[in-house]
């Protein structure tokens, strides 16, 4: 499968006086239609990396190629049209007086007819389950609802790439699950490439591939299942998922399970087989 993002020997530091680099000589790719999770300790370079990809920061060295185009000052705005970002705090992204106004805001500079704009707004809100709230003020929404509206604003623009930068970290467990299910549906419906930054391995399990960052460098690249089999997750800033904890506890009590399980439902199915 062809890559939609190629990052080559990328380095960046916030201040030239720094002796260390916030991102140091990293190289990786993202395939078209892939879901890539980027994980690691706070300060490992995750958010800096996606901000470099989106052109919010300028690299000191190296190159970024988006869908065959090398990111430069000349084409940065055209490339940004292919990328949609959702941040940790949705309040920072709201500009409209109502939900539908906010989703429509990004479309106003694309030369679309009013009819096409209305169609896209309604389709995007329906896709994230927020169509009934289109006349609501954003301030009156819950955290999970705000994030879904933020995603709708991105989806309405039809980007090829969706970046979630800690987008679920302020939500409760139910809100996180709902948002991740929404993203799964969007990815399927629009064949969208997804990059997500998160510490929660239950969410990481949904991805195709995981890139682990440590001190500004790429520590490893693997599948979620390979990552879950590691015994040093705490050393790379990750909590052991509940399925792994339960498997370990059962093993200590004489019930050895042969595999690593990505989700609680996978483990549940296996336990039912053993009963």
Regions found by a protein language model. Give the residues of each.
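Conserved ABC ATPase signature
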Residues: 137-141, 145
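The feature captures the beta-strand-to-loop junction immediately N-terminal to the Walker
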Residues: 39-41
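Conserved ABC ATPase "signature" region
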Residues: 115-133
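Helix-to-loop junction immediately C-terminal to a conserved catalytic motif
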Residues: 54
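Conserved ABC transporter NBD signature motif
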Residues: 62-70, 79
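Catalytic Walker B motif of ABC-type/P-loop ATPase nucleotide-binding domains
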Residues: 162-165
